[in-house]
Amino acid sequence: MASATADLIVFGMLSSLFGPLLVTFAQRFHISLPDAGVVLSVYFVGAFCGVPLGWYTIKHLTGNVVLTITLLTMALGATGTALSPNWFGFLASIFVMGVGFGGVDFSLITLLVRTRMEGRARRLSVSNAGYGLGAVIGPVLIVLVHPNNYRYLLGAIGLSAVLLTLGNSGIIAPPMRDAPRRDPIVVGARQRRLILGTFIAAYILYVATETTTAGWIAPQLHRGGLSASLASAITAGFWLGLAVGRVLAGPAERHHSQRRLVLTGLGFAAALCAGAYATGAAPYLYPLVGFSLALVYPMGLIWYTALIPHDGDGVALLILCMMAGGVIGPAIESVMVSSFGIRVVPLVLCGFALACFGVFASALRFTPRDRA
């Protein structure tokens, strides 16, 4: 679990850089802020493509080899991004980094889901808390290094990814095709399609909510009058809330059901995003949005596996499709900002959170007893 957490810390650092650096990217490449926001979508297009790569390799290669391949892919993209002299080369390198992220994210989640049921929620939550911790560190490093020196930061992250490959030798995970056959899926085919389709839609909206929030906090606050450094620090606060919330997943699950944790978190997130329309309140509310969203990702996966046990392929498809949210969410936000101005940001975020709440709530019609 330590290796998985370390990998996700680095990817959290990387993913959290884009939002605070959007203004810098716009100035560096002489483009508009909404055009710079395309970075977020390109990154997740790459992640979407990286999941099938992870899916194929984890079935045919050992877990440590898969993680090494995907980490080196990310390092290649980070190096290219640091050295790119023009916008299109920069976007191509962002895409390659996204491929690495998608592969690592899918591989790690698949490996953790394959572990024994006892303590699985804690392992998922703590490992994903590493992503949140890294995402706290990223904006802080931007403040320390200065946004205009982002290329050095990206180069250092690429080097960190290479060094992390040295710790993969301790991961013992045979190819999935060689793993012992697990119990068969006991849910009927039609019911499985309904449940899987519901959770795919819910997770697309969740990823849209999380990535768009993280990506547009800094531009909104910077245009609202805050310094770039303070806006980056508040983005770090969002990720800190996410990390703290995920660390608390174990105790929370002992007292509340996964569905209650998911729906309560989304409800609070929607209300807080609506409140962030008030410019003075936004800096204080966004860290609370992160805390509210913290348990949705891990608890939603546990909820799904409770409804359809032993469905490794379903989880793989879920992770693949959810990456679309990272493309759709920022793209919609960019269009809305172009049309209505920067103040529309929190309203779009609220809409995503409410839609996600509605789809997850519709999953209440399914129970673990739904068998066919």
Task: Map each language-model feature to its residues.
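Helix-to-loop junctions at the C-terminal end of transmembrane segments
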Residues: 50-62, 146, 245-257, 337
